[in-house]
C-alpha cells in the first residue's frame, strides 16, 4: 500500500506525510495519465480501434479509485487502532459553559476532559462514525479545486523557434496544442476527476453545521490550540472570526513555526485582542501521551 502511494505521488518523505491532506492534491496528473496512456495506446490497425480509445481513461479511473479508496481505508484503520490517551499531561482549559470545535477524530475531549459531547462539534467526523459503520461522516481530503489542480499540472510553455513567419508560427502553435493524443487527454481528464473527488467539501460542511457557527453570540473568549491555519481548514476559523473578531483570542504556536500564518490571519480578520502562546504555558502537571 505505502509503496503504491510513494510510486504514484513521488517524494513521499516525512515532510510529505506531515502535511498529508494537503499533499493528497499534489498528484502529478500528466505523469500518471501519460504512463497509463503509453501502455494503453489504441491499435489503429484493428477493426475494433474505436473501442480502444477509452482504454487508458478506464485504466486511470480504476487505478486511482482503488488507490484513493485504499488511502482512506488505511487512514480509518489507523485512527481506530490509536490507543486511548493516558492522563499524564493535560491542558489547563476552561470547560464549563464552553463550546468546542475539534478537527481531532478521537474522543480526547470527551474521555480525558469529561466534556459532554453535546458541547463538541467534530467537524470532520469522530471515531464513533467508523465504529458504527458510518464512514461517510468521516471526512478526509485536500483543499484544491479544479483550477488549482490544472494550474499545478499546467503544461510547459512552447519553446518557439526564432525566425518563424506568421503562417509558420500559427502552424507550430497548432501542432504544439495538438501534441497530446485523444486517448491520453481522456486519461488526463479521468485523473483530474478522480483527484477532485478527493477534495474536502468545506463549503458543504460549513452549510451542514451552520447552527453551530451562527450561535456564537455569547462567546467572550476564543482559544485556538494546535491549529495549523492551513489553507484547507482556514474557512472554519474564518467563519468564527466573522462573528467574534472583537473578543479576546488566544492562539497556540508550536515552536514558533506558525507565526507568519497566525499574524496574517489576525490582520486579515481584524482581530485586535489576541495573545499567542506555547501550549507549554497552559500544561497541567501531568503528561498526555499516546502509546503506539
Identify the function of each model-found stretch:
Residues 1-131, 207-225, 230-246, 251, ...:
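Active-site periphery "cap/insert" segments of enzyme catalytic domains
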Residues 111, 131-133, 285-291:
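Short, solvent-exposed polar/charged micro-motifs at secondary-structure junctions
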Residues 125-128, 145-151, 247-250, 274-277:
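Glycine-rich loops and low-complexity Gly/Arg-rich segments
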Residues 239, 247-292:
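TerminUS-proximal long segments
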Residues 146-213:
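Acidic, metal/cofactor-coordinating or nucleic-acid-engaging core segments within structured domains
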Residues 1-18, 194-198, 275-292:
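Extended charged low-complexity segments that act as oligomerization/scaffolding linkers
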Residues 6, 10-14, 141-150, 162-172, ...:
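Noncatalytic linker/hinge segments flanking ATPase motor cores
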